[in-house]
From Swiss-Prot:
Modification after translation: Proteolytic processing of ORF4 polyprotein yields the VP4a, VP4b and VP4c capsid proteins.
Keywords recorded for this protein, A-Z: Capsid protein, Virion
GO CC annotation: viral capsid
Role according to the record: ORF4 polyprotein codes for VP4a, VP4b, and VP4c, three of the four proteins that self-assemble to form the icosahedral capsid. The capsid is made of VP3 (coded by ORF3), VP4a, VP4b and VP4c.
Stretches assigned to coiled coil: none
Name assigned to this protein: ORF4 polyprotein
Protein species of origin: Nora virus
């Protein structure tokens, strides 16, 4: 019985050229070079070649007759590598002097070299594209052929005039007296895949800079190998494959009495089936070439039906090209790449008043793009190169800094290039958080894109030295989710500090495999007219909901509500209730053991059944407030998942309004139960509503009956006490996880559990007296999960602290977002305000911290502060960030001087009062503070 043959699929074709050369004919009908004498062929008419590494078919002259090669099938180990990892790689050569020859040897990619290194023998075919930029006055005449035996032997080939047709393609099939040769040795006298370029005549004008530059692309294709090379039977291991145990706490051992135990039998656990990998289908959105005047552009298609949908946020932006940068193109000294970074959130050039490019990024939390080419791309850059006839060349542009797709822009040509977000370019150095590789959404503030360019062909006359080219931008396929109220601008002098906090502390490196999901029909669409704030999305964010995993456990125990909070909360202030469900305490009883915590102890995996606008949903919360009849007011509430913890912290610190984030509900209580149509529930898209103590308003049923257009008259309305409505909403978790697998360290580095924010407002009594606090209770259930992998004989279990709420964990990659919110708030610079106190505490904690992956809310609020001004604290943190990598210690950082020279852009007078210094800083950031 023959050993089985295995198949490997290589997706996304690295280094594929997606915009080719206009001077390279695509069909034989287009090519009339032989009939007009531009090309003199000794090898017949050109043939059409299709290769996956080049977007279009092209015609190529066959320098050798193709043959059917034999691959010996009796030697152990064979591989049909084919065109996997093939790419057209450019090189530049100087044209040889008249009567001399240039031998161009073939090259192949690093990936091909790695795969071919597994075998001893191979054969392959080669393709060449030769391009000679021909500025005005070029008169060179070239001959190209495939060599034989030695450098003086000439074979049949082609002659062509670059001034009339600067680009020509060649096919060099395998030719050898042996069907395969040794990969690293070869055979004396073999032809190989090389070509020879000879200059026959050069009648170029004296103004043309010589020697002329010739660009040659080479592609090795149709590779077959035999003779497995490595007889290595060693076993290798990488950390990402292993079971990594949670550290087990060691109990103290009494010195006199050793602990003895009994032998226990091992119980084998049957592993559940893994997740199926299926190709996702992404639709390409229409980006108008010539948009209709005074008309919005069409909305881009979502990358996959499982992600949340929203209204068109870029309809007007997509009709205009925005100037971004000017680049200069001149004769390059080498083939190095130049990187152009575009930050659509912070860039000053894109932040002009009016219909600014940055606006959609600044008024939303999440953004994604289109997967029409196989991977996510967002913004579109246009490179349009005007040129005079005295200069000629080709610009090579990549849509990321990785080996992704390539566009070739001829001088005088134009190309539009969608660009890959930096955090999704596939490099381990850029995707630092799990959500960057597990979910297609990224935060708008981290949506930088990068493109790289280099000149691969360049010839000119002495009349001109370089070209200036404008890079234009459009939002392209960018789309957004989770709208917020607009933010204030941050002083540009603080950009580098915010950037450093976002990227300096972001040092996590987590490996894993991103898997795709089958497309499922989305849940019912919500009715946004019901809600006082925008809905988080018009449909559920289901990308990481895996319906095939787990089983539903029907226990009456799950129907018991868990009282997760009980107490007085201040009016007109945001109260945070962390819903760390794995360690939740039931305040209704001595609740270390409760329906929720017990589920985490019994199972390793808790899998959400459905999703809402924020992402996967595991249950619901319900808020109750038992107030006397003479008291009335309203309650704002929203539950923000762990990947939005910075949004929660900013509202706790009073930097942003709770009404400024989508999904916040306003519930009127006391007096008339419903004042007009104020919704009493957060937008519930998950279909998982299990309200406690009343009927949920704002769920899917309401979306169907459309309560917004079917209001009852006052006489028809029920009395408030007859059928009370529950103040309820979803409990979402971070969108990048498929299941809850609680490991405390992981959930501190990348929070998953949500924070419930509650803000009572305008509570007054019959005597029109304002209340300072009101008593509330918050119940929660976790009835929207399936279970998987039972656990027995556990040693490490989630710790539930008696009558204690969990602390809010702020991971290091969120520091920059919170700092930005402080810098946008003018009260943070006004002495005596709570925002100013929190700002000082936050900066102090940053300056005192050791190497940690997170801080907690309590670390900030319990931090003592001194009389040092905000301005000095900011400069101190800047100094710390700029010198920490060189080995500065915490003791060094506690110095009173910052080690910085005074700057002219910001006057910091240490001898003046703290109040005057901070007022100056506030006025420089917020001119409206001046009075």
């Amino acid at each position: 019985m023959q050993n089985p043959t295995q198949t490997m699929h290589i997706y996304d074709m690295p280094l594929r050229v997606i915009a080719g050369l206009s001077t390279l004919a695509k069909t034989t009908e287009e090519d009339d070079n032989t009939s007009t004498g531009i090309v003199v062929s000794e090898v017949g008419e050109p043939q059409v070649v299709n290769h996956p590494a080049w977007i279009d078919p092209f015609v190529a002259y066959q320098l050798r007759a193709p043959r059917k090669n034999i691959t010996p099938d009796f030697i152990f180990g064979r591989a049909d590598i084919g065109n996997a990892f093939s790419a057209f790689l450019p090189r530049r050569f100087s044209a040889p002097a008249v009567g001399t020859r240039l031998v161009v040897d073939p090259v192949f990619t690093y990936q091909q070299r790695t795969v071919l290194g597994l075998y001893n023998y191979f054969h392959a075919d080669f393709y060449y594209i030769v391009h000679v930029p021909a500025p005005l006055g070029t008169g060179i005449y070239l001959k190209i052929y495939a060599p034989e035996f030695d450098t003086t032997t000439v074979t049949r080939g082609i002659r062509f005039k670059p001034s009339a047709s600067p680009t020509i393609a060649l096919s060099v099939p395998w030719s050898n007296d042996l069907s395969t040769v040794e990969t690293s040795v070869g055979r004396v006298g073999q032809s190989g895949g090389s070509i020879v370029i000879e200059t026959i005549e050069d009648n170029s004008n004296e103004t043309v800079n010589t020697p002329l530059s010739i660009t040659v692309w080479c592609c090795m294709a149709n590779i077959k190998a035999t003779g497995y090379r490595h007889a290595d039977t060693s076993a290798y291991n990488e950390k990402g494959m292993n079971f990594i145990s949670v550290p087990v706490p060691k109990p103290p051992v009494p010195p006199t009495k050793p602990i003895t135990g009994e032998e226990q039998a091992d119980n084998e656990v049957t592993a559940e089936g893994g997740k199926l990998v299926q190709e996702l289908v992404y639709d390409h959105s229409a980006i108008p070439v010539a948009p209709v005047v005074e008309t919005q552009a069409e909305q881009p298609e979502v990358p996959v039906s499982l992600v949340a949908t929203r209204k068109n946020d870029t309809g007007h932006l997509a009709t205009k090209w925005y100037d971004f940068a000017k680049i200069s193109l001149s004769n390059p000294a080498n083939m190095n790449w130049t990187t152009l970074t575009i930050d659509p959130y912070n860039n000053v050039t894109l932040s002009r008043d009016g219909e600014s490019m940055v606006l959609p990024w600044r008024r939303n939390v999440w953004t994604t793009g289109s997967k029409s080419i196989g991977y996510i791309r967002t913004m579109v850059a246009q490179i349009n190169i005007p040129r005079p006839p005295q200069i000629s060349g080709v610009l090579e542009v990549k849509d990321s800094i990785n080996n992704s797709s390539i566009s070739l822009v001829e001088f005088g040509g134009k190309v539009e290039i969608p660009i890959i977000p930096k955090v999704m370019n596939g490099l381990a150095t850029t995707a630092s958080l799990p959500r960057h590789r597990l979910n297609p959404w990224m935060r708008t503030a981290e949506s930088k894109v990068e493109l790289q360019y280099r000149i691969i062909a360049f010839n000119r006359t002495s009349d001109i030295a370089d070209l200036n080219v404008s890079v234009l931008l459009r939002p392209g396929d960018s789309q957004f989710q989770l709208p917020m109220k607009p933010d204030n601008n941050v002083d540009t002098r603080h950009f580098e500090l915010v950037e450093a906090l976002m990227y300096h502390y972001d040092s996590l490196r987590i490996r894993g495999e991103e898997q795709s999901l089958p497309e499922n029909a989305p849940n019912a669409v919500s009715n946004p007219q019901q809600f006082i704030t925008p809905a988080t999305a018009l449909s559920a964010e289901e990308y990481n909901v895996h319906e095939a995993l787990g089983e539903t456990e029907e226990l009456e125990l799950d129907e018991f509500p868990v009282l997760v909070f009980k107490g007085n909360v201040p009016v007109d202030s945001v109260t945070s209730i962390p819903l760390d469900l794995a360690t939740i305490y039931d305040f209704a009883w001595d609740g270390e053991q409760n329906a929720i915590s017990q589920k985490f102890q019994r199972f390793a995996h808790l899998i959400p059944k459905s999703a809402g606008g924020f992402g996967p949903v595991i249950g619901n919360y319900t808020i109750t407030a038992n107030l006397p009849t003479g008291v009335a007011g309203r309650i704002l509430h929203n539950c923000l998942p762990g990947d939005c913890v910075d949004l929660a912290v900013s509202r706790i610190f009073g930097l942003k309004s709770l009404l400024g984030v989508a999904g916040t509900a306003v519930s009127a209580i006391g007096g008339p139960l419903l004042n007009g149509l104020v919704n009493t529930a957060a937008p519930i898209l998950s279909g998982a509503a299990h309200a406690i103590g009343g009927n949920v308003v704002g769920g899917l049923a309401d979306a169907v009956i459309d309560i917004g257009s079917n209001l009852l008259t006052p006489k028809e309305k029920e009395q408030p006490s007859a059928n009370s409505s529950a103040i309820s909403g979803d409990i979402p978790i971070s969108r990048f996880v498929e299941m809850l697998k609680y490991v405390k360290e992981n959930y501190q580095d990348n929070p998953v559990f949500p924070t419930l924010l509650v803000e009572p407002q305008n509570f007054i009594s019959n005597a029109m007296t304002a209340l300072k606090t009101i008593p509330i209770e918050v119940f929660a259930n976790m009835r929207n999960v399936k279970v998987e992998r039972n656990l027995f004989d556990r040693t490490v279990v989630p710790t539930v602290k008696e009558a204690t709420l969990a602390d809010i964990v702020i991971p290091n990659h969120m520091y920059g977002y919170i700092l930005r919110d402080f810098l946008q708030n003018k009260r943070a610079f006004q002495s005596g305000t709570k925002q100013n106190v929190y700002f000082q505490q936050f900066l102090t904690v940053l300056s005192q911290r050791n190497i940690r992956t997170h801080i907690t809310l309590n670390d900030i609020t319990s931090c003592s502060i001194d009389s040092e001004s905000i301005a000095n604290k900011i400069e101190r943190v800047k100094h710390y960030l700029s010198t920490n990598s060189s080995g500065e210690t915490t003791e060094e950082f506690s110095r009173t001087d910052t080690g910085l020279l005074p700057t002219t852009t910001r006057k910091i007078v240490l001898g003046e009062s703290k109040r005057r210094t901070e007022r100056y800083v506030a006025e420089t950031v917020f001119p409206s503070v001046r009075q």
